[in-house]
Amino acid sequence: MAEILLTSVINKSVEIAGNLLIQEGKRLYWLKEDIDWLQREMRHIRSYVDNAKAKEAGGDSRVKNLLKDIQELAGDVEDLLDDFLPKIQQSNKFNYCLKRSSFADEFAMEIEKIKRRVVDIDRIRKTYNIIDTDNNNDDCVLLDRRRLFLHADETEIIGLDDDFNMLQAKLLNQDLHYGVVSIVGMPGLGKTTLAKKLYRLIRDQFECSGLVYVSQQPRASEILLDIAKQIGLTEQKMKENLEDNLRSLLKIKRYVFLLDDVWDVEIWDDLKLVLPECDSKVGSRIIITSRNSNVGRYIGGESSLHALQPLESEKSFELFTKKIFNFDDNNSWANASPDLVNIGRNIVGRCGGIPLAIVVTAGMLRARERTEHAWNRVLESMGHKVQDGCAKVLALSYNDLPIASRPCFLYFGLYPEDHEIRAFDLINMWIAEKFIVVNSGNRREAEDLAEDVLNDLVSRNLIQLAKRTYNGRISSCRIHDLLHSLCVDLAKESNFFHTAHDAFGDPGNVARLRRITFYSDNVMIEFFRSNPKLEKLRVLFCFAKDPSIFSHMAYFDFKLLHTLVVVMSQSFQAYVTIPSKFGNMTCLRYLRLEGNICGKLPNSIVKLTRLETIDIDRRSLIQPPSGVWESKHLRHLCYRDYGQACNSCFSISSFYPNIYSLHPNNLQTLMWIPDKFFEPRLLHRLINLRKLGILGVSNSTVKMLSIFSPVLKALEVLKLSFSSDPSEQIKLSSYPHIAKLHLNVNRTMALNSQSFPPNLIKLTLANFTVDRYILAVLKTFPKLRKLKMFICKYNEEKMALSGEANGYSFPQLEVLHIHSPNGLSEVTCTDDVSMPKLKKLLLTGFHCGISLSERLKKLSK
């Protein structure tokens, strides 16, 4: 979509202009002027793109070509900027005056071409009267349909009986906080249907009632007028002083209102000035539905939230059956063939438990012959035409996103369906693509801003939370299949990305591919063998089992590639030859290799000046490159659990001495690094480091970490692996931000309360000797939620987790994980005061014969 490309161009031009100003000063003032002009013009064009799209959606086909021209212009400008930056960096590096002059002329000529195209676009815009406003007629039609549906007499709910009963009990509870029930969830789950049935069941128990559709662009005056009409306020009072008269009446009435589809909190701030508090003695109630959990949380508090989930398979098929046969119990599957029933179940499975998708699909099938052939054709087309009815509703949520968040949402479509996606990956890929840019004056890191975007997507119920980290952040997430299809369709329509299935075709279209993802080995290899021209490719995702994929990549330069992700899913360890051409990807910012692969990154990788993230999965035995790093932007260097592998497989002495060539101000993750190649004085330079892992920790490193004033003030995660018992006692009490600590020692290590950070949330002790003294220290940690003891030796056979006389023991601990204990035969907790928040006791590995007290037995199941 044009607005996405325009945003990318704006962000890149801001970055380039800033770099020119800092690095070049007055010598390249003319370049900065051109870059600034590009930025201004792209902002101006972006300001009226939404209006142009609204006119096209409203039936004005004349603007279609204009939008296409804008999209092509934005793409060409992005290409120019991506091609421009490496050239200027190269000319600066060698300081060739002639080369600089030649490049300047070339760039100036391209800018002149762009200026002429901008003039033409602006002329056409004025001709079609496209202005900077938002008037999406198609949305208005959809809103009207929703208003009709809101008052339609359809209260049948399938599979939501438990939700209904819980909500009814909550709503009638006299102690309901704020008097609000918030039904939240992704589009299509049946929030409105459930809320309507609930509302209609209880409204007779109140003196007045009303249901209103709030909409995406609400007006408080219209909503209040609607409420006034429904509760019987006289016409004269509505005309004279609506708000005061309405509030006066509601103060003495017990009311219930259903506010459907609330998109943001601003409208509530206006409405609550008129609506009396619901938690008063009168006992009024408000039911809201929203796609955004934060809206419900803001209006009614955390306790008001009730999150709907997709239907289970049998409930889904029950709803499908009701809709297919129009709720006629006399007309059912009795006369259908078993094959037709199976096809029906497969169709329902494709709907992913979303009631809206099931209803739309059933409605379409009712218009067809009830034959296996007809239904099979529908099944084969699932993911495209069948979901069109849902797409309009889902697209509302997409269009409501801030422009900067839209490409972040579309990125989920690059992954296979039902794939669990790490937040770390998403955040750093968004940054690599310049979807997230830190503006001047903003002290927050790009990672923090990207995390805000991810939290917002989850809050809007567009993305499903899978796991949280030790400190409550999002660790991984998923996207529902229905929304995944929306991402793929929108991306294909706008040329944002393409899947393998639609990558083939006109060579001209293939040459314009900017992002592509492969889920199949055969399709991937066939595509590369076709020798496509991929001159504009920015992102390449490969989910494969065939290790030969790397050899096929060797034939391409990928000169504009920003992001490369290779995920190998074969079960065996495979040696791969990573092409030396990887070092020619001058625009590469993000590289992730995952799976059972063994090989070496080419040394030319260190020459990539724009590299920001190298992330090697824990199963991948990939030898790092050697040489002096030239990138001043490297933020994350992650060899996850690489330490155990590298000691036996590779010599890395040629790599780590060059760690000093990294730009210390940007580095945030360094995992793992052998201590023998790591001078403790380097710690003082890593002022923004958040995650650090060191192998074979020496006494000098322990001493440096233990000084009174912390050397790593931003550190949040610390992993230390000792190859021998340290003589120095570690002291981490001066590190307030460390929330996750991993200590791997050789049996003995003197520890006390000063050894640990004060705000520790997750602690892992590996190969540790545990005695009653260290256990007494651990019991006092005020914020510890997860404790893992991995292959530890226990001096006493019995580990008593209860507190002393005051009962103070693990006040916040939620998970205790004991793996392959040595010398432990009994774990007890004999009181209910100790570990009041413990939810889970995990015994894994070799743990035969360990007895548990009754309370712990229940938590270990």
Curated annotation (Swiss-Prot):
What residue ranges carry the coiled-coil annotation? 63-83
Q: Name one GO cellular component term.
A: plasma membrane
Indicate where this protein resides in the cell.
Cell membrane
A single GO molecular function term of this UniProt record: ATP binding
Check the record and name the SUPFAM superfamilies matching this protein: L domain-like, P-loop containing nucleoside triphosphate hydrolases
Chain sites annotated for binding ATP: G185, M186, P187, G188, L189, G190, K191, T192
Q: For this UniProt entry, what is the primary localization, expressed as one broad class?
A: membrane
Residues of the NB-ARC domain: 162-388
Record keywords, A-Z: ATP-binding, Cell membrane, Coiled coil, Host-virus interaction, Hypersensitive response, Leucine-rich repeat, Membrane, Nucleotide-binding, Plant defense, Repeat
The way this protein sits in the membrane is described as: Peripheral membrane protein
Q: Which GO terms describe its biological process?
A: defense response to other organism; defense response to virus; plant-type hypersensitive response
Name the InterPro entries on file.
AAA+_ATPase (IPR003593), Apaf_helical (IPR042197), Disease_R_plants (IPR044974), LRR_dom_sf (IPR032675), LRR_R13L4/SHOC2-like (IPR055414), NB-ARC (IPR002182), P-loop_NTPase (IPR027417), RX-like_CC (IPR038005)
Tell me where the LRR repeats sit in this chain. Answer: 225-248, 305-327, 388-411, 449-472, 510-536, 585-608, 609-631, 652-680, 689-710, 712-735, 736-758, 784-807, 810-835
Annotated Pfam families = LRR_14, NB-ARC, Rx_N, WH_DRP
Oligomeric state and interaction partners are given as:
(Microbial infection) Interacts with tobamoviruses mouvement protein at the plasma membrane; this interaction triggers defense responses leading to programmed cell death.
Leftover remarks: The Tm-2, Tm-2(2) and Tm-2nv alleles present in the tomato mosaic virus (ToMV/TMV)-resistant tomato cv. Craigella isolates GCR236 (AC Q71BH0), cv. Craigella GCR267 (AC Q71BG9) and cv. Yukang 2 (AC Q5MLE9), respectively confers resistance to ToMV but not the tm-2 allele present in the ToMV-susceptible tomato cv. Craigella isolate GCR26 (AC Q71BH1).
| Record's function text | Inhibitor of viral mouvements which confers resistance to some tobamoviruses including tomato mosaic virus (ToMV) (e.g. isolate L and W3) and tobacco mosaic virus (TMV), but not to resistance-breaking isolates (e.g. Ltbl) ToMV and tomato brown rugose fruit virus (ToBRFV). Elicits a hypersensitive reaction in response to avirulent (Avr) movement proteins from resistance inducing tobamoviruses (e.g. ToMV and TMV) strains, thus leading to programmed cell death.
Give the family, as the similarity comment puts it.
Belongs to the disease resistance NB-LRR family.
Q: Which PANTHER family match?
A: DISEASE RESISTANCE PROTEIN RP, TOMV SUSCEPTIBLE PROTEIN TM-2
Protein name listed in UniProt: ToMV resistant protein Tm-2 netted virescent
Naturally occurring in which organism (per UniProt) = Solanum lycopersicum
According to the entry, what is the taxonomic lineage of the organism?
Eukaryota, Viridiplantae, Streptophyta, Embryophyta, Tracheophyta
